[in-house]
From Swiss-Prot:
GO biological process terms on file: iron-sulfur cluster assembly
A Gene Ontology cellular-component term: cytosol
Named cofactor requirement(s): iron-sulfur cluster
PROSITE patterns: HESB
Role: Required for insertion of 4Fe-4S clusters for at least IspG.
Database matches in PANTHER family: IRON-SULFUR CLUSTER ASSEMBLY 2 HOMOLOG, MITOCHONDRIAL
List of residues binding iron-sulfur cluster: 42, 106, 108
Organism this protein belongs to: Haemophilus influenzae (strain PittEE)
Name of the protein in question: Iron-sulfur cluster insertion protein ErpA
Amino acid sequence: MIDDIAVPLTFTDAAANKVKSLISEEENTDLKLRVYITGGGCSGFQYGFTFDEKVNDGDLTIEKSGVQLVIDPMSLQYLIGGTVDYTEGLEGSRFTVNNPNATSTCGCGSSFSI
């Protein structure tokens, strides 16, 4: 876990509060939000979010408001400088990634290229 040093990724209050709410609904305080990148989507890479009880060797863990965001080292290299947020709007509610490393994104924002 990172404390008081430069964190390479921002985990917003909105995202942390939604994670806290979802963990409460599941009644499992061991859950953490894992963000990862896989190949696919219309732009080459896509973001994924899942709840995970494990933190693997090499994972980066960012804690906010009593909940944890976990990123594997391979995904982190594509996410440095980014922001994990939670938004609600006309397209529905979802976790999002604002990624300054992406050179282009698809219309829905779920895939990107570098």
